[in-house]
Amino acid sequence: MASKLFLAAALLQGALSSPLAVEERQACAAQWGQCGGQDYTGPTCCQSGSTCVVSNQWYSQCLPGSSNPTTTSRTSTSSSSSTSRTSSSTSRPPSSVPTTPTSVPPTITTTPTTTPTGGSGPGTTASFTGNPFAGVNLFPNKFYSSEVHTLAIPSLTGSLVAKASAVAQVPSFQWLDIAAKVETLMPGALADVRAANAAGGNYAAQLVVYDLPDRDCAAAASNGEFSIADGGVVKYKAYIDAIRKQLLAYSDVRTILVIEPDSLANMVTNMGVPKCAGAKDAYLECTIYAVKQLNLPHVAMYLDGGHAGWLGWPANLQPAADLFGKLYADAGKPSQLRGMATNVANYNAWDLTTAPSYTTPNPNFDEKKYISAFAPLLAAKGWSAHFIIDQGRSGKQPTGQKEWGHWCNQQGVGFGRRPSANTGSELADAFVWIKPGGECDGVSDPTAPRFDHFCGTDYGAMSDAPQAGQWFQKYFEMLLTNANPPL
């Protein structure tokens, strides 16, 4: 009903503001609606104010940024191949990461979760020293909040409604998982923070840079839009240049970036996967380019650092330190490359007293133990790295995982610690929510495109899962129910 009401309102607004016939508007998808994709049979144009952007062969979406209705042809039938992630004590699989959602309704007004403490404005440059999360508040992700309010809440009842509303207010990261979002969503996200600061706040923006060519090389669920064989490195550098342009336009907004989840960790453990071996040089070149280009005074960057059940195994720690230490040096030791983000889209706890059975025999069975073991090895390579830890889905411990390497839509998990710079650790800058809880990790249907076997029910994944990035209501409700601290 909510979506129908929004569509009606959008149609009415279009009719009032434009001489075009209502019938023409009704033939085009509303903002955030689907406008193309494999086997899609709906509208292939967008209403005024949006443009149809191809995310992948299965999905195109109407994103803000065009003044006229636009069209896109349906993608041709094809398939993408990928080698599934491995699972062994020294080569643990990465966690899944979101791609563009299939339907995102209009954003709603949200309010920051903490009290404003000061601000800045256009024409100035934000700056900080040390921990970029210290002395600043985080702003809710309106893109994610809109999903919660219009995709999740309408079908909830009782106490879950209030819990979901609370989740919508928790600050989380906005993902730039396709190049088009740099021009459509990124300016709005930064403008929201600028406006809040102008009203007396002191807020930072949180973004994920995620569009490497041959992305997600060890899995199938989140393959991206760029291919190394088709000029992907050049296209990626243009994507980074576009991000830099937006950051310079909003130099008054302190911005925290997570750089390329599920990428370089594969270069440590998954060189036996042909796609990863073939992508290594491109991954390194692209990542170095990114951290050099985005090395701006108001920006803090964190490379993705896997998690305790991946790079945290003793046999993986030194090779990981060697790789990241060399990259840091090869990039010229960027001043704004603060450290690493761990546990992105995964389920690990921060600090446990008892090891879950599925973590045996790894002595680094939580993220605190992992970074405590990893940091000295990085320091020995010349990088005094600090860490941020994703706790968005780490509330329930132990989880329902059968094995630690099972990463996709795992059951028995819940929303976790709320974002905070009060970590009690000199190494940990902040607890954060990087993965948007409720967006699917990967499709569970073995016959579907982009199916990864880790997303099958035999691996503990929840059934009836849609494609990666699509809203997964049943999973979201589980996260609400199992939240710790409770919502």
From Swiss-Prot:
The main enzyme category here is hydrolase
Which GO-annotated molecular functions does the record name?
A: cellulose 1,4-beta-cellobiosidase activity; cellulose binding
Could you tell me which cysteines form disulfide bridges?
A: C35-C52, C46-C62
Q: Which reaction does it catalyse?
A: Hydrolysis of (1->4)-beta-D-glucosidic linkages in cellulose and cellotetraose, releasing cellobiose from the non-reducing ends of the chains
Record's Gene3D superfamilies?
1, 4-beta cellobiohydrolase
Active-site annotation: D216, D262 (proton donor), D441 (proton acceptor)
Q: How does activity depend on temperature?
A: Optimum temperature is 30-50 degrees Celsius.
Annotated CBM1 domain residues: 27-63
Q: Which keywords has UniProt assigned to this entry?
A: Carbohydrate metabolism, Cellulose degradation, Disulfide bond, Glycosidase, Hydrolase, Polysaccharide degradation, Secreted, Signal
What does its pH dependence look like? Optimum pH is 4.5-9.0.
Q: Hey, what's the signal peptide range on this chain?
A: 1-17
Work out whether the entry's keyword set contains Nucleus: no
Q: Which SUPFAM superfamilies match?
A: Cellulose-binding domain, Glycosyl hydrolases family 6, cellulases
Query: What's any GO biological process attached to this entry?
Result: cellulose catabolic process
Q: What are the start and end residues of every segment in region (Disordered)?
A: 64-127
Write out the annotated subcellular location.
Secreted
Q: Where is the composition biased (Low complexity)?
A: 64-117
Binding site residues for substrate? W175, D177, H307, W310, N346, W407, K435, E439
Sorted alphabetically, the Gene Ontology cellular component annotations on this record are: extracellular region
The record makes one more remark, namely: The biological conversion of cellulose to glucose generally requires three types of hydrolytic enzymes: (1) Endoglucanases which cut internal beta-1,4-glucosidic bonds; (2) Exocellobiohydrolases that cut the disaccharide cellobiose from the non-reducing end of the cellulose polymer chain; (3) Beta-1,4-glucosidases which hydrolyze the cellobiose and other short cello-oligosaccharides to glucose.
What family does this chain come from, according to its entry? Belongs to the glycosyl hydrolase 6 (cellulase B) family.
Q: What is this protein called?
A: 1,4-beta-D-glucan cellobiohydrolase CEL6A
Q: Which gene encodes it?
A: cel6A
